[in-house]
């Protein structure tokens, strides 16, 4: 079952996302914004800036501004904002958020056209889903990226 705006706001009140802007809540998702840290996947260089322009063929890791906490009874799926897809940006199919995850999300972007991104702009939508039952071991006990902040290379 996908959470609606009312349930998302309740999740937020229980510490689900920080910082929180109520304008980012949609009927069945919450927008998450771009942070200011990036890793160029071509050369491994790390950047901290308010704006980044991706050239065609460029691939980067980025991070969300928001730190999220997914309780063991929820999971999430991340989708690129369609306005960015229409500009030629792809988000790699690594958009699953396990129950029990806490941290900023690492985003894998690939540009097909020149695209300029601003820190603080909404870039993805997080859709939260209710689990039938809690897992035996949630991500807080098993995950390699639990508690991450900033873009994180593969471990």
Regions found by a protein language model. Give the residues of each.
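DUTPase catalytic domain/fold
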Residues: 1-155
């Amino acid at each position: 079952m996908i959470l609606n705006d009312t349930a998302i706001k309740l999740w937020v009140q229980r510490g689900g996302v920080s910082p929180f802007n109520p304008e980012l809540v949609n009927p069945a998702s919450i927008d998450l914004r771009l942070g200011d840290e990036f890793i160029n996947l071509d050369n491994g260089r790390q950047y901290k800036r308010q704006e980044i322009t991706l050239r065609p063929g460029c691939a980067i890791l980025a991070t969300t501004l928001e730190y999220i906490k997914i309780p063991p009874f929820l999971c999430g799926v991340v989708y690129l904002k369609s306005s960015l897809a229409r500009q030629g940006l792809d988000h790699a199919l690594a958009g699953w958020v396990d129950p029990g995850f806490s941290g900023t999300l690492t985003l894998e972007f690939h540009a097909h056209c020149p695209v300029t991104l601003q820190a603080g702009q909404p870039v993805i939508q997080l859709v939260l889903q209710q689990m039938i039952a809690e897992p035996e071991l949630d991500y807080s006990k098993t995950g390699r990226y639990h508690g991450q902040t900033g873009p994180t290379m593969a471990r």
